[in-house]
Swiss-Prot record:
Annotated organism of origin: Marinobacter nauticus (strain ATCC 700491 / DSM 11845 / VT8)
EC class name: transferase
Gene3D superfamilies: Enolpyruvate transferase domain
Broad class of where this protein is predominantly found: cytoplasm
Pathway listed: Cell wall biogenesis; peptidoglycan biosynthesis
Function: Cell wall formation. Adds enolpyruvyl to UDP-N-acetylglucosamine.
Protein name: UDP-N-acetylglucosamine 1-carboxyvinyltransferase
Similarity comment: Belongs to the EPSP synthase family. MurA subfamily.
UniProt-annotated binding residues for UDP-N-acetyl-alpha-D-glucosamine: R93, D307, V329
Subcellular location: Cytoplasm
Residues that coordinate or bind phosphoenolpyruvate: K22, N23
Length: 420
């Protein structure tokens, strides 16, 4: 397994380009299954999960044309079968997103129960229940979700018991081709959900209310082709901004948007960062100062994102004062804290809250990534620490960050990949 070797205590300084959002690209790639004509998806990040989703479509017989800029043209009508096998689904939870489009467009689907990051129980029962309300006949057997429908799905009024991003996306895609009106209540409001809705609208779907807790979808008979560019990755944007703040540096991130990152930018300003923004860029400057500790509570969008708490935990570890981080979205999301403690962080865990007292500096150590965002926090810790840090199991990082060591090198970091 590859590792990252980081030599710390250098403030980051420079400019980088932000990649397309993986969490928007995956549902949009799944949505191409709904169209009768080719759909081209642009601004895709070069990531393992994207490759897996493209491979999954290819395994089903879907014809794909990929250019050198990672734009993909998808011809869903060439599909041969409707089976998403365990060996692909186990590596990526988002494979469940093909369930709704397959049932809605082709009347059947067989999708393995998902795998992915080891952060708590993320149930798929809301997807299944919603599709059943729309008339799908679903059995779960031998580790597979097997769904069928006679004719078109029917619009339904669906209340989601908990806010679920992939559940909202799956049901919104299915409803786009259903007969009649579907209302999704307690829907996820994340920018990636909005981006999927905008792509579906570009394909001819009739959707209103995306970005609010109530989405209304009037089903249409068919969806046509379109060309759609995926929105920028707000978590990648936030990660590089926090890395610069934690090291007392300056960074300008380009090809991104501030409007999808407001909760994070407010916390960075609270930590003492000077932030300026333009139409497609954000600049952060710590002016050489040590960050101030911040307290935060994660919750679904537009509140503070769970995918950014690990990075702030790393920053708090060397900040002035102490801060409390409360995780309300997922259990098991503090696995990185033990590794930070091994590097000298002063952290007390109380249930779903972590109290972090800033220390003058961390010390480099061998550490191990446990999930995608935890691994980003360990990289940030390594950038701040005295001496060398080796981050193991970085396949987690490669699932969510495109060329992380190359982008950090552009910002002046001493970081390199050690091949297995």
């Amino acid at each position: 397994m590859d590792k990252l070797l980081i030599r710390g205590r250098k403030p980051l300084d420079g400019e980088i380009r932000i990649s397309g959002a993986k969490n928007a690209a995956l549902p949009i790639l799944a949505a191409t299954l709904l169209a009768d004509e080719p759909v081209t998806v642009g601004n895709l990040p070069h990531l393992n999960d994207i490759t897996t989703m493209i491979e999954l479509l290819g395994r089903m017989g879907v014809e794909l044309l990929i250019d050198e800029k990672m734009s993909v043209e998808v011809h869903a009508n060439t599909i041969k079968h409707f089976h998403a096998p365990y060996e692909l689904v186990k590596t990526m939870r988002a494979s469940i997103l093909v369930l709704g489009p397959l049932v809605a467009h082709f009347g059947e689907a067989e999708v393995s129960l998902p795998g992915g990051c080891a952060i708590g129980t993320r149930p798929v029962n809301l997807h299944i229940h919603g599709l059943e309300m729309m008339g799908a006949d679903i059995k779960v057997e031998n580790g597979y979700i097997k769904a069928k429908t006679n004719g078109r799905l029917k619009g339904a009024h669906i209340f989601l018991d908990t806010v679920t991003v992939t559940g909202t996306e799956n049901l919104m895609m299915a409803a786009a081709l259903a007969e009649g009106k579907t209302i999704l209540e307690n829907a996820a409001r994340e920018p990636e959900v909005v981006d999927l809705a905008e792509c579906l609208i570009a394909m001819g779907a009739d959707i209103k209310g995306h970005g609010t807790a109530t989405i209304e979808i009037n089903g249409v008979e068919r969806l046509h082709g379109c060309h759609y560019n995926v929105l920028p990755d707000r978590i990648e944007t936030g990660t590089y901004l926090v890395a610069a703040a934690a090291t007392g540096g300056r960074v300008k991130v380009k090809d991104t948007r501030e409007d999808i990152l407001e909760a994070v930018l407010l916390k960075l300003e609270e930590a003492g960062a000077h932030i300026t923004t333009g139409p497609d860029w954000i600049e952060l400057d710590m002016k050489g100062k040590r960050p101030k500790a911040v307290s935060l509570r994660t919750a679904p969008y537009p509140a503070f994102p769970t995918d950014m708490q690990a990075q702030f935990a790393a920053m708090n570890a060397v900040a002035e004062g102490s801060g409390t981080i409360v995780e309300t979205v997922f259990e098991n999301r503090f696995m990185h804290l033990q590794e930070l403690i091994r590097m000298g962080a002063d952290i007390t865990l109380e249930g779903n809250a972590a109290i972090i007292k800033g220390v003058e500096h961390l010390t480099g150590a061998p550490v191990m990534a446990t999930d995608l965002r935890a691994s980003a926090s360990l990289v940030i810790a390594g950038l701040m620490a005295d001496g060398d840090t080796i981050v193991d199991r970085i396949y987690h990082i490669d699932r969510g960050y495109e060329c992380i060591e190359e982008k950090l090198q552009l910002l002046g970091a001493s970081i390199r990949r050690l091949p297995a």
